[in-house]
């Protein structure tokens, strides 16, 4: 006998039962109420198939009959079915009421879980310093300048006259000279200046005579100059 694949979860077992007994079990949509004692029928019919154990079958049945879609199907006037889909009696009021309470409790548990999750999210957001978005600040409209009409001449911008700083004319610096008062104090080779009007020319003493001082200008010309025309 070949090894058969093993079903690992109750959902896989329910999918197998829906395929094996399609008139009794369903994988989706509203489920039909099951026959009382259907567990033993399953043990007898699927013994050895898919390596299913009684524990797996019992867990799968518990999950199937506690699902919302099964509890929705347990309502007044509904009929129980066996593995082949044959009717096995109408639901009594006690079973309908029990299913209604189970459904309400299941919904309440889900709502409580959602509320708890929302509270945890809010606490986490508060701990992280996240604040609700503040209302946007109203922006003041920027003053609009009147737009130039199409075809209107554009006025040239008035240019500000650039004020030029008045130029200061520097007066020529007048050289200060010291007149030679005693020619006997002069020495040959000494540098001095010879006054000629408003100017003074550089010169060198060549000889001191009784008539004055013989000097040589930078131009190479030599001449005798009296003391009143000599300055330092």
UniProtKB/Swiss-Prot annotation:
Coiled-coil region list: none
GO MF, any single term: RNA strand-exchange activity
Disulfide bridges in this chain: none
Superkingdom of origin organism: Bacteria
Xref: InterPro entries: ProQ, ProQ/FinO, ProQ/FinO_sf, ProQ_C
A biological process from GO: post-transcriptional regulation of gene expression
Extent of Basic and acidic residues compositional bias: 117-138, 147-177
Entry-linked Pfam families: ProQ, ProQ_C
SMART domains: ProQ (SM00945)
Assigned keywords, A-Z: Chaperone, Cytoplasm, RNA-binding
Listed SUPFAM superfamilies: FinO-like
Family indicated by similarity: Belongs to the ProQ family.
Protein name as annotated: RNA chaperone ProQ
Organism in which the protein naturally occurs: Escherichia coli O139:H28 (strain E24377A / ETEC)
Lineage, broadest ranks: Bacteria, Pseudomonadati, Pseudomonadota, Gammaproteobacteria, Enterobacterales
